[in-house]
């Protein structure tokens, strides 16, 4: 049964304003969540406008199905497949804006049964879509120690990754972990130096969650697809919550804002240069939440909004 967990949408107005909504435009909300961005987009669309929302969380889909609006449709699936969804609807090159609000949502964190939080004891799951793939518990019980250490180091930037991985494997040999509290306790015991501002399990939980949900690969694929589906002048409005996400978004926007890089002195005709094409995006900058928003919603503190526009190239 789905509880009514409160969710405060971060950078709500800024992210939607970044789309530069046209009343008759076609937009994608790739991370519906609890519908904060979608509802604001719908309020700015005219009768001819359309909004396609995507989410892989069944609880988000249940919320989306309560929206009775002919301009709105919801897809249960990963946003990495947005290119397929757009192609199926014959909308390639016709999308006027894509919004992505990355990472885990407050309702997912606050619901102990989802297994995302070390602050609330629940099943060690962490899947955005609990109907697909391996849970965190299943992966940790079958993965090699070296693989766990790599994930913790790469996706959690955890400096004690090897020690924690060893402790996880040893604990699972004795008795397989199935609860978030068990993992949090194992990590805390294996961490020799504690950060007084951060729970010792913070980085491990982030890393395992990112790995279980292939989050960074999802982002990279969605960004790649966006170039094909956006209309000239179409906008990308993307909110990230940690450096790994933001690094991917920043690099993508920077690289596609430069156009093809031709080595100095390489002899090329004007025709050859035309075939290489020009830049595909124009980066429009970044925004961060103000002090007032952070005070009202501490989880907004680390968020970064980046906006870019598709060029005619």
Curated annotation (Swiss-Prot):
One of the record's GO cellular component terms: cytosol
Pfam families assigned: Methyltransf_5
Which is one GO molecular function term here? Answer: rRNA (cytosine-N4-)-methyltransferase activity
The listed locations are: Cytoplasm
| List of residues binding S-adenosyl-L-methionine | 35-37, 55, 79, 101, 108
Q: Which reaction does it catalyse?
A: cytidine(1402) in 16S rRNA + S-adenosyl-L-methionine = N(4)-methylcytidine(1402) in 16S rRNA + S-adenosyl-L-homocysteine + H(+)
Q: What are its E.C. numbers?
A: 2.1.1.199
Instruction: Give a GO biological-process term.
Output: rRNA base methylation
Q: Which UniProt keywords apply?
A: Cytoplasm, Methyltransferase, rRNA processing, S-adenosyl-L-methionine, Transferase
Q: What class of enzyme is it?
A: transferase
- Please describe what this protein does: Specifically methylates the N4 position of cytidine in position 1402 (C1402) of 16S rRNA. In vitro, active on the assembled 30S subunit, but not naked 16S rRNA or 70S ribosomes.
Under which name does UniProt file this protein? Ribosomal RNA small subunit methyltransferase H
The species this protein belongs to is Escherichia coli (strain K12)
The gene name reads rsmH
């Amino acid at each position: 049964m789905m509880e009514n967990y409160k969710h405060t949408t971060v950078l709500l107005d800024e992210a939607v304003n970044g789309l530069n909504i046209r009343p008759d435009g076609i937009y994608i909300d790739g991370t519906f969540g609890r519908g904060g961005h979608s509802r604001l987009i719908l309020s700015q669309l005219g009768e001819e406008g359309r909004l396609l929302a995507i989410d892989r969380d069944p609880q988000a889909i249940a919320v989306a199905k309560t929206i009775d609006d002919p301009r709105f449709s919801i897809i249960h699936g990963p946003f990495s497949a947005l290119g397929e969804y757009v192609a199926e609807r014959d909308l390639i090159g016709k999308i006027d804006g894509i919004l992505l609000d990355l990472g885990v949502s407050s309702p997912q964190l606050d619901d102990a049964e989802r297994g995302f939080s070390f602050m609330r004891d629940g099943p060690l799951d962490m899947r955005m879509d609990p109907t697909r793939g391996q849970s965190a518990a299943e992966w940790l019980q079958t993965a090699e120690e070296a693989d766990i250490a790599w994930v913790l180091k790469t996706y959690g930037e955890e400096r004690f990754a090897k020690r924690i991985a060893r402790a996880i494997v040893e604990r699972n040999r004795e008795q397989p972990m199935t609860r978030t509290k068990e993992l949090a306790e194992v990590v805390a015991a294996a961490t020799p130096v504690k950060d007084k501002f951060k729970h010792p399990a913070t980085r491990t939980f982030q890393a395992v969650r990112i790995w279980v949900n292939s989050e960074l690969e999802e982002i990279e694929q969605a960004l790649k697809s966006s170039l094909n589906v956006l209309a000239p002048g179409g906008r990308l409005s993307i909110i990230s919550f940690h450096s790994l996400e933001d690094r991917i978004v920043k690099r993508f926007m920077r690289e596609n804002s430069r156009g093809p890089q031709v080595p100095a002195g390489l002899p090329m005709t004007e025709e050859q240069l035309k075939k290489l094409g020009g830049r595909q995006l124009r980066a429009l900058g970044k925004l961060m939440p103000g002090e007032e928003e952070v005070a009202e919603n501490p989880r907004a503190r680390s968020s970064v909004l980046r906006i870019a526009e598709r060029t005619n190239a």
